[in-house]
Amino acid sequence: MSSSGQTQFRYTQTPSKVVHLRNLPWECVEEELIDLCKRFGKIVNTKSNVGANRNQAFVEFADLNQAISMVSYYASSSEPAQIRGKTVYIQYSNRHEIVNNQSPGDVPGNVLLVTFEGVESHEVSIDVIHLVFSAFGFVHKIATFEKAAGFQALVQFTDVETASAARSALDGRSIPRYLLSAHVGSCSLRMSYSAHTDLNIKFQSHRSRDYTNPYLPVNQTAMDGSMQPALGADGKKVESQSNVLLGLIENMQYAVTVDVLHTVFSAYGTVQKIAIFEKNGSTQALIQYSDIPTAAMAKEALEGHCIYDGGYCKLRLSYSRHTDLNVKAFSDKSRDYTLPDLSLLVAQKGPAVSGSAPPAGWQNPQAQSQYSGYGGSPYMYPSSDPNGASPSGQPPYYG
């Protein structure tokens, strides 16, 4: 709409004590709205973060003439209304007062519904969520899932007071950068109260956790059937887990061999088989573990990790449909670590890199993690220790 058209529209509207503001900057807060409007009169109510993009707001003045004064001023001014340097469009609202009816999400409860904005589900682990919210009190349970609104979580506290304190402190804030991987941008938190009062967690997994019951079995199933959001009740397909990971290797500036992959992935458990192949012009690999929990832990830790310093050879991981790989026991592109005679095959095959034999313990996943480089390339380990120490004892590099 042209400037003249907007001016005409303002004057053809029926004046109201409530002013409608559009095109607000991201995360515009009530104080910024009041600061813009207060010189025109007394403000009695506000309602912000409305609209599909949450970039609109309503401001109610005590007197109709005060609202008219504001709309008329900016309709004739050569300087548009601005908040944080962004032009804000102002017009009369169709409503004559702001009624803040409480939606179900506004009724206080002990369970918070948290939306993580700006990230994918694999970029914020359940351990990070627990760390952030446990600062306000004991967290009983957490369930994560994906909806149309994005990656979300239900966080259960002991009581309403604790949940309210967490919401007041964290709503609209961002998770500290040091808790996120280097490639992840800002992660903002949006919160409302959930209608749930006690989450039904059947298994411990990377998608759900019950901190009140340490004896709950570990299972790849994300949630009990009664927790519909965690099972993708909105129809969105939930990724099926597997003991075999499919890895896409991006930005390959250095060679990635079977031994290099074994070094990386064996830090999280015994690797049974590895196969490297080319598909659609990119290098991919299949890594087989003995069970799903080990594969899930490796996937969570290594997704987005760069094998080499400088952001090279970044891993993008998903679960494979395979459960048992059929690979050649020993080749340049595959390895079967379940064979008892593997060391003999290595000896027959001869030197692996730069004229030197592979490290004596390379077929042993635990021994493999004792050397920190491969062929002189700047490989950096991901952290497998909760305190941030790498398997080699050197500071980890998070790519």
From Swiss-Prot:
A GO molecular-function annotation: mRNA binding
Annotated keywords: Acetylation, mRNA processing, mRNA splicing, Nucleus, Repeat, RNA-binding
Transmembrane segments: none
Region spans: Disordered: 352-399
Statement: the UniProt record of this protein carries the keyword Repeat: yes
PANTHER family in the record: MATRIN 3/NUCLEAR PROTEIN 220-RELATED (PTHR15592)
This protein's name: Polypyrimidine tract-binding protein homolog 1
